[in-house]
Amino acid sequence: MLRLLRSSWARGLGSGVATWRPSAGLFRPGCPGIRQASGASDTPHHQSPSSESPVQPVGVGVCSMMRLPLQSSPEGLDAAFIGVPLDTGTSNRPGARFGPCRIREESLMLGAVNPSTGALPFQSLRVADLGNVNVNLYNLQDSCLLIREAYQNVLAAGCIPLTLGGDQTITYPILQAVAKEHGPVGLVHVGAHTNTTDKPREEKVYHRTPFRRSVDEGLLDSKRVVQIGIRGSSRTLDPYRYSRSQGFRVVLAEDCWMKSLVPLMAEVRQQMGGKPLYISFAIDALDPAYAPGTGTPEIAGLTPSQALEIIRGCQGLNVVGCDLVEVSPPYDLSGNTALLAANLLFEMLCALPKVTTV
């Protein structure tokens, strides 16, 4: 059973401190500096606290994803938001370790229903925030082991993880856990880079290698892998050739320019069928005009509306896990990148199986 690594939280300058009982474990509270709201407990809610307290101003209460209850265990949950504050696998600009906290902060303004799709996730699923995986920032290999162990426990409880990254490295140990539970899975990967590099500088694990390592270990059903938004210069064509040689469908960003992606997603739905599917969304898929706060930006990317079309196009599929990675708050001065990330994670929640619509 997983436990939050609990500590003292402060509401702000000059305020009292709400003390958490110390407990060793794989998870820790998601966003320090905010006091836990009175009455919060481990009991999961069907309804988002955002809608239960519509007059509560932003910045007051629990600093959790959408003000959901913080829970120390995945038991009894259908889905959970989990932060993985890791960026030691980054090759360019760091800062993704701060992504989970910033995304949670921007999520405080989100509502509980999706008027565009009619999805009612909190009336359909039991959802909570499990805090952050207690990674080891000094040892990437150890962090991967900790992530895999944490997600194995979450998945064994029948809970679908929705992950706040962190750099793309984290997808590899998450897929290890997902494949252990579900077998090889299909993948909808949205990002600027294929992340199928082999071993630059003899490093097998970092944010450009997760899907190559996943193929090596048989974690993916390669005939059901789609990569959307790929673009930018490259030192070699090997990653592109490798993806296609494995049977991945690679959709370049140029093939998405100035068009709706609804027809593409209709084809993807046919390709995925009813088998388990994992969604991995790197925020660098979006053009840096919309999402500048990322470690490895590339020009001429997707638009937010296309991102919505991709995620909404997965609604009704057998989604068994999702992640949103590569948000780097130090390069996100306006907060717009984290705001986009929070909204896309909400859309992923709305696309999960068993979510009812009106």
Swiss-Prot record:
Compositionally biased tracts (Low complexity): 46-56
GO molecular function: agmatinase activity; arginase activity; guanidinobutyrase activity; guanidinopropionase activity; metal ion binding
Gene3D superfamilies xrefs: Ureohydrolase domain
Cell cycle found in the keyword field: no
This protein's UniProt keywords: Acetylation, Arginine metabolism, Hydrolase, Manganese, Metal-binding, Mitochondrion, Transit peptide
Cofactor(s) the protein requires to work: Mn(2+)
Enzyme class: hydrolase
Record region (Disordered): 31-56
Transit peptide: 1-36
Tissue: Detected only in liver.
SUPFAM superfamilies: Arginase/deacetylase
Name assigned to this protein: Guanidino acid hydrolase, mitochondrial
Naturally occurring in which organism (per UniProt): Mus musculus
